Design a protein with these regions (language model features):
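Histidine/acidic residue-rich metal-binding segments in metalloenzymes
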Residues: 70-84, 90-92, 109-115, 142-165, ...
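Active-site rim beta-loop-alpha module in soluble metabolic enzymes
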Residues: 168-177, 203
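Non-cysteine beta-strand/loop elements that form the S-adenosyl-L-methionine
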Residues: 46-51, 116-126, 164-171, 207
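An N-terminally biased module of ancient metal coordination in phosphate/nucleic-acid-related enzymes
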Residues: 5-97, 101, 105, 110-113, ...
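Charged catalytic cores and adjacent phosphate/nucleic-acid-binding surfaces used
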Residues: 5-21, 31, 42, 127, ...
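Surface-exposed cleft-lining segments at the edges of enzyme active sites
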Residues: 132-145, 173-184
Length: 283
């Protein structure tokens, strides 16, 4: 187990509720490697949330089956691992849905079919493109892409209700040409406030996704100003995820996640089991 300063270790969030394995198109990591690393990191619970992005635009590299989760094998395998690791760590079974406004019925059917513990709803496309490729930024400026993403997010969460938390709210900023220089809560407060109000009124939560720091943004998703606003508006449900696609990133920067949440007014973070929120006091 890696050694950390005692103060940080004692205040570390120990539940990682966003990670990907080889069941996701963009990860090659074995489930066992992820779970072993989580145990080494001292986590007491994790939720595996592999990708299901129906109607993800095909490309030459990934083909038409990109980000389609093999649920028929996913569930039996993870149930087996949950039992195998039960003396070492609590394993929850989740999924990350790539939201598009026309997918509500399809996703509802999927979620009703399997007893997931936790469902993340995330926006991975804007104007029909994954911002990861950079193409959409060639056509539109950063600010316009960001605004479109927030508007499309609002449309999706108004139409799709079969998720528990909204993942990495300002994810799109990672891939902008100017990244955070073109982004602040204040510049997009109208759009962001509508998203936050919709989540709260629908009983949905927000994710603190630590991967923004890994990608060099200097902040986790969403920006602390958005977290503070969510709390001001009455938001309480907040999960913490590394969004790890490799074992080495399990619990990424979780040593500072608790203090970040506290600085934004939170005293509890959230886990999910059987789709029910469980609140844990921040150390």
């Amino acid at each position: 187990c890696e050694r950390m300063p005692k103060r940080l270790k004692e205040t570390m969030i120990r539940s990682d509720f966003h990670m990907h394995t080889a069941f996701s198109t963009d990860s090659e990591e074995a489930v066992e490697s992820m779970l072993n690393r989580a145990v080494e990191r001292g986590l007491y619970s994790v939720c595996i949330t592999d990708h299901m992005d129906a109607d993800y635009p095909p490309d030459d590299e990934m083909g038409e089956s990109a980000f389609r989760l093999d649920t028929e094998n996913y569930f039996p395998f993870l149930l087996k691992k949950k039992k195998e690791y039960e003396e070492r760590i609590q394993v929850r079974i989740g999924i990350e849905l790539g939201l598009q406004k026309h997918l509500g019925t399809r996703y509802e059917t999927l979620i009703e079919k399997y007893p997931f513990d936790f469902v993340i709803g995330s926006m991975h496309l804007v104007c029909g493109e994954d911002p990861y490729t950079g193409k959409v930024f060639e056509e539109l400026g950063d600010a316009q892409v960001y605004r479109r993403m927030f508007c499309e997010t609002l449309e999706c969460i108004r139409k799709i209700k079969c998720f528990d938390v909204l993942g990495h709210l300002d994810y799109v900023v990672r891939y902008g040409k100017h990244q955070a220089e073109a982004y602040s809560y204040e510049k997009f407060s109208d759009e962001i406030d509508m998203i936050l109000r919709e989540l709260i009124s629908s009983g949905k939560g927000l994710e603190l996704n630590m991967a923004g720091i890994k990608y060099g943004l200097g902040f986790a998703h969403p920006h602390p100003s958005v977290l503070r606003r969510y709390k001001e508006l009455g938001g309480e449900i907040i999960t913490v995820g590394s969004d790890a696609h490799k074992a080495e990133h399990i619990g990424y920067e979780f040593e500072i996640a608790g203090e970040l949440l506290k600085s934004c007014g939170f005293r509890y973070y959230t886990e999910f089991e059987n789709r029910k929120a469980v609140f844990r006091r921040i150390p």
